[in-house]
Structure formats: C-alpha cells, structure tokens
Amino acid sequence: MAGISGSASSGGVYATKTQGGLTVTGLSKSFGKTRANDDISVRLIPGEVTALIGHNGAGKTTFLNQIVGLTRPDAGSIMHDGTDLITHPAQARQVCAIMPQVTSSLEGVTPRQAIATAVRIRGLKSKQAQRAVQETLDTLDLGDWADRPGHKLSGGIKRLTSFGMAVTAPAPIYLFDEPTNDVDPVRRELLWTMLRRRAEQGATVLIVTHNLLEVERHADRYLLFNKGRLVRDEPTSALGLAEAKSTLSITATPEFLQELRSVLDVKTSSSLGNMPDTEYIEKRIEDDSSIPREFTVTLSTDALELALPHVLSGIRAGCVESYRIGSASLADNYEEMINHD
C-alpha cells in the first residue's frame, strides 16, 4: 500500500533538529548503460523542506528509491544516525515514510480507512491513530470524501489520500515523489502546510516536484538533478524568478519584430530562446511587412523587461495589435538553470 514503509521510530516521535537527517556520499546507480545517479553527495538536514527538481529521467525517483531501500546503489553510502541505510535496508524502511509516484488504487477502502491502516502499520495505537487521521483529513480538507469508497474518488483526492498515508504517522524522514500531481491549487497549499509542519517538528522532508513556483514559495532549499548528477544545491532564495523564462505572444508586423530583435541583441546577453532568426523575419517582410502576424517567443526576465516598452511603443505606432505574457515551459526554465552551470 502506498505510503507505508515500516514501523515508526522508537517512541513514535519526530527527529529533533540536532539529530537524524541523511548524509549521502558518492551515490551511483546504473541501469544497463544508463547512469541514473552519478556520484551524488548531499546532506539533508532535519527541520528543512528540500525540493528535488529536474527533467523527467534526471534520476530523482531512483534517488528516493535508494534512500528507502527499494533500489540498491552500485556505490556510495546513505548515513542516518551512524547507520548506513544501504547495508541496513530494514532500518531505512523503519525511519523513512515514502509517498511513491504511483497513486494507490484505494479499491475497496475509503480515505479514512487507508490512512488509518498506514499509520497503524507505522506503530500508532488505535486512539493515537484515530486522532492523527482526523487531523490529516481536516488539514487537507478531505472531510467530504473521508468515508467515500475509493472507486468513487477523483484522481486528486486519491493523490491526497496517498499523501496522507505517508505524512500522518511520525517518522524522522519523509520522502514524497510528485505529491501535488492532479491536486487542485487550494489543496496544494494545504499539502505544503503539512510538509512545513513536519519540518518544524524536526523531520527531514524531501519532495520531488516539477512546480518551480511552489518550490520557491514553500521549500527552504532545492537540489537540481541533470542526467543523473546533482548540478545545484542552493537555498530557494537563490532560485529567483529572475532565472525563470516567460513567453511573449505578440501579434505584430514582421518589420516590428525585426526591430525588437535588434534591440534585444544589442542590450542583453540573455538567451532569446526561440525568437525567430533574422533570416526568417526578413522572409516575412518580403511577403508583406504590413500584415500583422502572431509570434510566440521565449525570453528571460531581463529580456522581457527590455521588450515591453518597445511593445507598448509598437501599439501606439500601430505595428502591434496585441500581446500577452505567460510562463514558459518547465523545460525552458530547466535549460536556463542547467546552462548556467
């Protein structure tokens, strides 16, 4: 059952901020010729919420599975309170609570029953378990679905139930693999509230996610994986929306776009993403420079700040019909971060 990983630690308490945590050294794992994790060394600290980000296939899930003892590394160590969890996988399952990427089916059980079963397996007595389960249901605003059969639940409610199965009982270490997938925006905030609460109680919290804005808002620190390697380990204050890219969709004449590109080429060294090249723009001008065309370009924040005054001038001059700004794809933002290293 998702979210269950052995019994609770002695006494059923969270780790204190002066003990616990994880020290990973030289962790490597290959599947055939694919290097899933490549010489990863990192210290995960009690009391912190750490986000693990990176492209699909970057090695994030493999990293979690090695911590909890589901996958054995080829090399390296994972130390917790003086014990190498690689050579003591039973201890890993005892100290770690994990929410896997795959959502539990919940066939034949309600959210209340599923969470209660998980916390009892982790060592909570009946009355303790009942109180803890109710607290989770209340915090995640699951009251309306608490006693509804699993086959009648939406994907988001099932996902929150799997999260509750992992987070409710005390554990020194919590591992979550994309817990906010399929979850509505309001309950995403409630989920992060529970993660923060566990960290404040002294637990070590590691969450895999693809939502950079949530990482910046809620996590203390982020780890960036790329091709199996840890390429960044920084406080989230260093993540900065300044690094995030945006999309500028603009309906304008090709001639105006050429002028805009010239301005950005001269005044910024930032990546212009998929801004049409000069040859492409000149071909559109040859076709008919007076016909507005829609272009969508990806720009770094500083390039966007330079572009907007010219776009507004273009509107006044009749060269720009409309524009809109949106968030660039996660892939674009990851590429920007990775290319800086």
Where are these regions (language model features)?
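ABC transporter nucleotide-binding domain
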Residues: R196-T298
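Catalytic Walker B motif of ABC-type/P-loop ATPase nucleotide-binding domains
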Residues: Y174-E178
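Helix-to-loop junction immediately C-terminal to a conserved catalytic motif
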Residues: V68
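Conserved ABC ATPase "signature" region
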Residues: A116, R120, K127-W145
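Conserved ABC transporter NBD signature motif
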Residues: G76-T87, Q91-A92
